[in-house]
Structures are given as C-alpha cells and as structure tokens.
Amino acid sequence: MYKRQEQQFEIVHAYSELGIEATLSCTPYDRGIDSSEGIGSWAESNAVCFSNSYTSLITNRESGLSALATALTGWAPRWGLHIESNRMPNILVNVEAQMSNLTDWSILGDWIGKQILPTWDLPWGPMPRFVGLPRASFEMQKALAASAANYGCPMLWADGITQDAPEVGSYQGEVTFTEGDLEQRYRDLSPRGTVDLVVIGCPQASVGEARETAAAVRARMELGEAIPDHRLWLFMSSHNYDLISADGTLDLLEEAGALVLKDTCPEVTPYNRSKYNHLLTNSLKAEHYLTSGLNRIPTSVATIIDCVAHAFDDSLADGPTPELDGHSATPIHTAKTHQEDPFESMGRGIPSQTQWEVSGKALVTDVPITYLGYVNRDTGVIEEPGHPLDGVPIKDTVLIYPKGSGSTVAPFVLMGLIYTGFGPMAIVNRDVCPLTLPAASLLGVPYAHGFRDDPTIRVNTGDDVSLTLSDGEVSLRVDARSTED
C-alpha cells in the first residue's frame, strides 16, 4: 500500500513540475469552473457529462493521456462533441417518478445505462433527453450526470433544467422510468447484512451534500448519540473541505465521530478487509466501481439520511456479510448470432500507424468494454458479471468491440496489460474510441475502426481473421469460421 502511495505522490509531483495545478479533485466544475466556456479537454467521466450538459464548456470523453497532450500543446483534436451536429440526443427518457431525493437521481442515471440495446447506434455514447423531471438542485444535477457516466454518457438534456434539446427526427430508443422502477431499484440495492462502513462522496461531496449529511448527523447527536468506530467517511475536495471547515460543518461531523477525508475518493481507497466487507453509499457511481474488480466489496445504496442512520446503528441491517454473486447478474443485452457467410470489409487506421499485418483468433462482443474495474489488471480477464465475455481473457486476441465505456482511466489499464504481455495483439472498434486509441497508438498495437460493415456482428469469437493496414485503410477478412457452440 505504501509503495502505491509513493508512486502516486511521484505522479503528482511530476505534474506539478510541469506547471499543472494539482487539485486532486474529480469535480472541477464544483469550484467556480462551471462558469467557463469554449473548448475543454477533460478526462474525468462525471465531469465530462456535467460540463457538456450544464455549462458552456465543450469537451469529448478524453483520457488522461489526451488531456495532458492538450495541456502541453494548447490544442485538442476537433472531432466528436466539438462538432455541433454530433451533440444530439439519441435516447428519450420519460420520467414518471417523483424524484424528490438526491439518491433518486443517482439511481436514474445508472438505470439508463442498463436499458441500452446493442442495436442502438450510439457513436458518441448514450446521450439521453429526460422529459418529466422536476426542478433540480446542483447536487441532483451532479448525481444524474455522474451515474449516467457509468455507461459512457458524455452529455444529457433535461427539459426545464438544461438548455433545450435539439430536435431530432427519431431516437434510437425510448424508455420510461416509473415510480415502480425507482422503488424496485431501492429494494435491489438495500443493505442485507451488517453494514461495516458508510461512504459518502463519489464524486467528491459538494458543500450541499456535506451539509445534508451534517443535518442528518445533528438530528442523532441531539438525542445523545455518537457514531461508533468512525463508521461514516465523507470524501471531499480540498476546496470544499476548506469551505465546510469555515462554516462549522466539519467540526460537527468530526465531533459526531465521522471521518472527513480530502483529495481522495471511495473508489481508490485501500480498505482494511479485516474490518470492511460491506459498504453503504448514496451513490450509484460508488456502487458501480466498489463492487467491480477495482475493490470487490459488496456495496449497498440508500439515501443520505438512511446512510447516516446505519452509521450510528450497525444493527439496522443485521445478518451475515453479503457476498458478490456474479452468477445471479442479469445478462447484458446482445444481438450477436453465429455467422457463417464469408466476410471481408474495409475500415480505417490511425495516422500514427502506417503499415502492419496481423492474423489471429478473434474475440468479439457487441457490448462495450469497461477497462477500469471490469478487466483484471493483472490477468487481462474480463470480469463483468452479465457481460457476454465475462471470464474470458483478452490476451493475444484480435479484440473486436464497439468502444470503451465507463471510466476514462481505461487507456492506463490497457497500457498496463500491453506492457505485461496480457493485452490483445490488435484492436478493432466499431466506433472510434478515445479511451482505446491512445493506448494503441502509444504502444504500437494495431488499431482499426470505421468499417463499412459492423465487425462486432459479422465476426464470431474464435474466427481466424487477418487485418492489413496500407495507405490508411484497413482490410479485415475472416479466413476461417469458428464452429457454433
């Protein structure tokens, strides 16, 4: 653990030496930057969605690599969401739930991602328009954007909250979120078994979230209660930490027995697993990554007031510690069927690669791959319960998938796998992927995209395939079909 801390400090120091301000925050929009406008280059998934949706700052879903390149050069590639015609809603969401609580909004954003079908054409990711939402606080807007980013959402529209959504002829999909859907998600996510620790602040808590937490804490303190064993952790940026320190909120929380941590978040905290094996949070973003391979900790979700209640009383959800059960996960939608016809198609390469030839076994899915937390960083095995490729290694394959999803940390995970020999021999994306392309470009892994025919549908896992790059064009050919399982 201490070695990882030292390495992290080395990275922060290196950035500082470049003249970069080290805010150590995943919520840059929560310190006055929300008034910015123009072209940005942001590499935090929730911040990308918040910026594009609620401010005048325009950014693609950048990786840390491309954002750093923009900082060094002052230029960002003009593509994707920088182009007005690409900033169009592609999913219509009718909301029929009351949405009165902050956690309701977090649940809604995550729920959208679970409805996506692989047949929907979403080249820039899911970009929903919400109809029927009530007025939203800053915290509600933040919660919606953050959890929608779990599934790669770079931008959203909400009637009466954001700028008006551009009119489109038709949507790729239309879904309705009812009060019943909301109640069912709360039931699915509610704690079963003793809660070991409550974590709030993913993304890092705003001043409003800290005050809401403090209000719930104060109500228990007035009854003479205290939080045992520091069972409540609140994560914040230094900027917001200083603000709650000045207004007395910090003193109240610490007096009650809460821990307030700054410049980090629940996702990257090294938990003592001899003490903490069941977490409770108010955030679907936290739940998404805490239960993933990043942490592998059973995590439940509740409102802030219920989270605080569990922090004070560890008997509210009595019983054995729950376990993560990937076998019970709902299968993610897939449209793949076994293909037998001959197949050859032309696509594009990238300017940093001029010529290569690759032959190998294809590993194919029409479902996006989330590298951070859902591809094992040591083995390269996909570990996402319900994913069509769950349990399958990507090592030495021609990896074919639509695009990367989830965290924009993806290229660093992919680069680590390539360095250690557990990465793919070549990558084919249906849509050009800003999370995959930088790693492939820097480390010379053959990369192709933009094929005339969808390779995620037309190629089977196990097919023998050949790819050739020449003059910027890539030919993809199936040499031999796999047998159907």
Model-found features: residue ranges?
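Gly/Ser/Thr-rich loops at beta-strand to alpha-helix junctions
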Residues: 28-33, 101, 134-137, 203-208, ...
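Glycine-rich, small/acidic residue-mixed loop/short-helix segments
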Residues: 239, 278-329, 438-440
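Conserved mixed alpha/beta core segments that line enzyme active sites in large multi-domain catalysts
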Residues: 9, 23-86, 91-108, 357-390, ...
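Feature captures the catalytic cores and cofactor-binding loops of soluble hydro-lyases/lyases
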Residues: 218-293, 343-358, 362-473
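Intrinsically disordered, low-complexity segments enriched in small residues
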Residues: 14-21, 25-28, 44-233, 304-338, ...
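Short acidic, glycine/serine/threonine-rich loops at helix termini
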Residues: 34-44, 81-82, 139-144, 167-171, ...
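Conserved small/polar residues in nucleotide/adenosyl-binding loops
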Residues: 1-5
